Amino acid sequence: MKFTTNITLRALCFTFIMFFSSCAYFNTFFNAKEYFDEAEKIRLEKEGERIPVSAIDKYGKSIKKSKKVISDFPESKYVNSAIILMAKSQFHRQEYDLAINNIKSILNSVENKQKEEAIYWIALCKWKKGNLQTAINELEDLIS
């Protein structure tokens, strides 16, 4: 009886640990997304003006959480989404080269919808850097 209880307790502990560890990467990605959404809300309230420091700070926190998903949970299904989210945050922080490099690192491994979003953000970064024709060409390729 004691042996069976011990095995049951171990199985329960193992299940508990597995459940919460699998939730960790989702929770970290969720936090990154929350910071991004908060930053977007602040930015859009001041549209047409400089991006407020509070939004820049939230984008920075989103980048930090996204990096945590990427480094701590490299096999997670959220890695590509975290990279795109990080690049979008970098775009709004005017870190265009970082955003482009991060997106390019996953361009061949993402599915169609994410690939279109990735190309769109690369084009926006190139446009902001002053590479207008390159940005236009990328967007034209995207819609053709």
For each feature predicted by the language model, list its residue ranges:
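Acidic, polar-rich low-complexity tracts and alpha-helical solenoid repeat scaffolds
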Residues: 2-3, 17-144
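Bacterial N-terminal signal peptides that target proteins for export
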Residues: 1-13
